[in-house]
């Protein structure tokens, strides 16, 4: 049996590992644009100097050899022929498969602002190459602007605090980490980053990028009319699934990404998908689970992804531990809110309705986070 796995991050690696565990004699080929196996979630630790390249890895040293995997690294897939069952690569080669797992992840989304994608000093923050470029470029910068205050944007800012640069954050929402946190919890981080010298602009978007004769961004004009000097612009305004190479195939994609069912199957025979390439539930644990589920079904073991509770985020920026579960604001007035806080920086917010908990935010003391996770995930009625 010939298995081909596209992508060497959470979904692809967990899928390849599971394939080998279930089929000791199979031919397994792993294809990835990355030439390293590393966790994107902790790239900012590399920027900060807290971890070296080795400590970014999430597999054992001899993972490839131990699992007898043929790894074609530093190469992207350019197409899939589902009838003849082969994948074409950017180096001109092609690989035949019996079963294919697509786990190509996602890439930085650049909003349609003139010069944003073309300027030499504009970059995303998605992979190791981005990280190294930012580290190198920041050495010759005075002013760095990060666009987007989601988890990726805050990761970047955290990785830049040790530099001598002036760091600014621009966000269209009214607070930092708006998907994960309410205004109270977000304000704690906002104040903490402010004391570190980070200038923050909320409820403001980028209206125009002012460039020099070489096309480099020198200044950013906000929708408020304010301007920010800029030597390096880092875009953290979201991601898009890596499905461009599937455009001429018969594999179904929608506006989010690759379409799969609960078994990881696509509409094409013997083609499976997992992880961020689907554009849904873009968190690490979900990608790992989807990779395993897909591998099981590729090997004929009937498995389904039943756990779609992806609204869980744990963070610890600037030594402030926080966990967000489910919704962070009530959808309407039928929901009730319970809030506890103290002078030690501990904050707890519970959103409930008819005896069931739909969301929670814990900051500082994360006790009972495990219990709350299960109550929300299983929709347990706590009123009984």
PLM feature spans:
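Glycine-rich Rossmann-fold phosphate-binding loop(s) that bind the pyrophosphate
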Residues: 7-11, 126, 147-152
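Beta1-alpha1 glycine-rich phosphate/pyrophosphate-binding loop at the start
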Residues: 1-69, 159-180
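A Rossmann-like FAD-binding core segment of flavoenzymes
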Residues: 25-27, 71-89, 95, 163-256, ...
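FAD-site-proximal beta/loop scaffold in flavoenzymes
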Residues: 118-141, 212, 216-221, 226-296
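Short hydrophobic core segments
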Residues: 6, 95-105, 228-238, 291, ...
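Rossmann-like NAD(P)H-binding beta-loop-alpha module
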Residues: 133-181, 217
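N-terminal glycine-rich dinucleotide-binding loop that anchors FAD/FMN and/or NAD(P) in oxidoreductases
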Residues: 42-71, 183-206, 321-323
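Mid-to-C-terminal Rossmann-like scaffold of FAD/NAD(P)H-dependent oxidoreductases
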Residues: 1-2, 8, 277-370
């Amino acid at each position: 049996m010939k298995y081909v796995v596209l992508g060497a991050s959470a979904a692809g690696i967990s899928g390849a590992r599971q394939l080998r565990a279930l089929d000791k004699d199979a031919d397994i080929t792993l294809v990835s644009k990355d030439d390293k196996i590393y966790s994107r979630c902790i790239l900012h630790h590399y920027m900060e100097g807290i971890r070296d390249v080795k400590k970014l890895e999430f597999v054992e040293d001899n993972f490839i050899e131990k699992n007898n995997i043929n790894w074609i690294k530093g190469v992207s897939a350019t197409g899939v022929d589902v009838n003849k069952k082969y994948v074409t690569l950017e180096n001109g080669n092609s690989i035949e498969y019996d079963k294919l797992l697509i786990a190509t992840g996602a890439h930085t989304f650049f909003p349609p602002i003139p010069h944003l994608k073309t300027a030499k000093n504009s970059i995303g923050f998605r992979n190791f190459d981005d990280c190294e470029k930012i580290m190198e470029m920041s050495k010759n910068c005075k002013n760095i602007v990060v666009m987007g205050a989601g988890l990726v944007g805050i990761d970047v800012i955290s990785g830049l605090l040790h530099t001598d640069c002036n760091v600014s954050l621009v966000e269209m929402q009214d607070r930092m980490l708006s998907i994960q946190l309410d205004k109270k919890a977000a304000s704690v981080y906002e104040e903490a980053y402010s004391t570190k010298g980070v200038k923050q602009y909320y409820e403001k978007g980028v209206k125009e990028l002012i460039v020099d004769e070489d096309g480099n961004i020198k200044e950013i004009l906000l929708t408020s009319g304010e301007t920010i000097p800029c030597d390096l612009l880092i875009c953290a305004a979201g991601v898009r699934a890596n499905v461009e190479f599937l455009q001429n195939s018969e594999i179904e994609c929608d506006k989010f990404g690759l379409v799969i069912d609960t078994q990881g199957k696509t509409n094409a025979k013997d083609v499976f998908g997992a992880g961020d390439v689907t554009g849904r539930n873009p968190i690490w644990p979900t990608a790992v689970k989807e990779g395993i589920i897909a591998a099981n079904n590729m090997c004929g073991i009937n498995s389904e992804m039943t756990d779609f509770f992806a609204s869980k985020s744990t963070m610890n920026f600037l030594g402030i531990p926080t966990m967000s579960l489910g919704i962070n604001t009530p959808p309407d007035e039928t929901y009730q809110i319970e809030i506890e806080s103290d002078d030690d920086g501990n904050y707890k917010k519970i959103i409930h309705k008819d005896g069931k908990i739909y969301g929670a935010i814990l900051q500082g003391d994360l006790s009972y986070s495990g219990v709350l996770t299960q109550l929300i995930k299983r929709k347990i009625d706590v009123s009984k």
